[in-house]
Design a protein with these regions (language model features):
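Active-site neighborhoods and metal-handling regions in enzymes and metal-associated proteins
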Residues: 1-386
């Protein structure tokens, strides 16, 4: 294994990841895994680029060296970030499924059981059908979930990056809270947040920060606008941070002016629900137990908001268009799997109350054997007052 120029994990950690993946491939009777998801390529090889809108794939045979396929404009990034020695660079105009199929034939995997990430947004129907046509003697099977299952529990180095991402997120949130004032625009708040995120060392994040105010705070995935803050507005902020592609996020709200009874009560409910959910979390606890603890606290308060969906999602390695690992593990009413030490979640008890606005309340937490550690600190959960 040849170390890349920028090595974010030890060779031993990469070797362990490859070995674990191959063990799972063997259990699933797969001879080779063709990987298209940027998170999974990064996890196994270290390779990263925001240019994954172009075709890229990592071919991992059960009993041979991996092969990486990339376009020419990304060629320099392979030795920069990845330990993969066999990289194949092809012209932009290449027939990428054909290239992939020919390499599978070359390494004598064309008549084997081939795993494809059938749940990945980066494996198009066209590519899948082309590979199926090119490899008539192969068994194409789903390889989705194999690498993801290993990503669930974070290693000590991964947790270190998560802590740093959380610190960056917290610094961005502090800057945002400080910037809120009557007459200030959402744009100006966003400028303060992003300046601090960049100065603190954040990379580009899987999703943008969400900064809204007043009635706009009811919009779940809306970003900042030119709207100016009015007296009596709730200003909602959900701020991410990213270090070496590992993410953390948190939500808070700021009330401008003298808060009324409804705002104070809603903030108390959201913060209580967040703490109750945290208190219920530790290794071995079923995910649905955590959901019930947090959601029942909200629902029984009769505040005008009901918690009906997941209360947390896994968070860690991410590239746009998302920062979460919710496709791997989410804490909801139907999830029976137990929590395990080393899992990281974005735990959310944010409430969007009609006529009031968004009560931002969320933290990134690390599950331990005895409980959870809150990674996003500095600004207390719930509503801040300006």
């Amino acid at each position: 294994m040849k170390p890349p120029r920028t090595q974010l994990f030890t060779s031993e950690e990469y070797e362990s990841r490859i070995q674990k993946t191959r063990e799972l491939m063997d259990q699933n009777e797969l001879d080779v895994l063709v990987i298209h998801s940027p998170e999974n390529i990064y996890y196994l090889s270290g390779y990263q680029t925001p240019g994954y809108y172009w075709y890229q794939s990592l071919i991992l045979p059960l009993n041979a060296d991996p092969v990486f396929i990339a376009p020419p404009h990304e060629a320099a990034l392979v030795p920069e970030f990845s330990w993969i020695e066999d990289s194949r660079i092809y012209p932009d105009t290449s027939d990428w499924p054909k290239v992939t199929g020919e390499i599978l034939k070359e390494i004598q995997c064309d008549s084997n059981s081939i795993g494809l990430e059938t749940k990945s947004r980066f494996l198009s129907v066209e590519v899948y059908e082309s590979l199926k046509y090119m490899l008539p003697y192969s068994r194409l099977a789903s390889g989705s979930g194999i690498i993801e299952s290993s990503r669930l529990i974070k290693s000590p180095r991964e947790i270190d990056y998560m802590r740093k991402a959380a610190e960056v997120s917290s610094r961005g949130m502090m800057a945002g809270v400080k910037a809120v004032d009557e007459g200030v625009s959402e744009l100006e708040i966003a400028a303060a947040v992003h300046t601090e995120l960049d100065m603190a060392g954040s990379e580009y994040t899987g999703l943008p920060a969400f900064i809204t105010s007043g009635e706009r705070s009811q919009l779940v995935h809306a970003t900042w606008s030119a709207k100016r803050i009015d007296m009596g507005d709730l200003v909602f902020m959900e701020i991410p941070g990213s270090i070496n592609r590992y993410h953390a996020a948190q939500s808070r709200s700021v009330f401008v002016g003298e808060p009324n009874k409804n705002v104070i009560e809603a903030s108390q409910v959201a913060t209580k629900a967040l703490q109750v959910a945290k208190d219920s979390m530790k290794e071995g606890v079923p995910a649905k137990t955590v959901f019930e603890a947090g959601s029942s606290t909200i629902n029984e308060a009769n505040i005008g908001y009901k918690q009906g969906r997941r209360i947390a999602y896994g968070i860690g390695t991410a590239f746009p268009p998302g920062w979460d690992e919710g496709d791997i593990f989410s804490i909801n009413s139907d999830e029976p799997r137990p929590l395990m030490a080393g899992m990281c979640f974005h735990l959310i008890t944010t409430m969007r109350v009609p006529g009031l606005g968004a009560i931002g309340c969320s933290d990134t937490v690390l599950v331990t054997k005895d409980g959870v550690e809150t990674l996003t600190t500095h600004v207390e959960p719930g509503v801040q007052y300006s």
